[in-house]
Curated annotation (Swiss-Prot):
The keyword Nuclease applies. This is Toxin YoeB. It comes from the Bacteria. Keywords: Endonuclease, Hydrolase, Nuclease, RNA-binding, Toxin-antitoxin system. The active site is at residues 46, 83. GO terms for biological process: RNA catabolic process. Toxic component of a type II toxin-antitoxin (TA) system. Has RNase activity and preferentially cleaves at the 3'-end of purine ribonucleotides. Pfam families: YoeB_toxin. Forms a complex with YefM which inhibits its toxin activity.
């Protein structure tokens, strides 16, 4: 499975690299879990609705969510910081 980041999600990921190594480890763990099974596993995966229909979310912690989509067996990470404001 190919893993790609949007420009915004890459900036989020880099922010965690510089500011919160513990949550960075959690994000990496979630990415590995998504690669194994995109719709089941840790982080309470849930399909998003309304304008985010087609995207999925997993909990990083109570403040942050990993938002992603799967296309042709490839993972595209939309955001990994905060909830769904963007």
């Amino acid at each position: 499975m190919k893993i790609a980041f949007t420009e915004l999600s890459w900036h989020d990921y880099l922010w965690f690299q510089q500011n919160d190594k513990k949550l960075l480890k959690r994000i990496n763990l979630l990415i590995k879990a998504i690669a194994r099974d995109p719709f089941d596993g840790i982080g309470k995966p849930e399909p998003l609705k309304a304008n985010l229909s087609g995207y999925w979310s997993r909990r990083i912690n109570s403040e942050h969510r990993l938002v992603y989509t799967i296309a042709d067996r490839d993972l595209l990470i939309i955001s990994c910081r905060f909830h769904y404001q963007r």
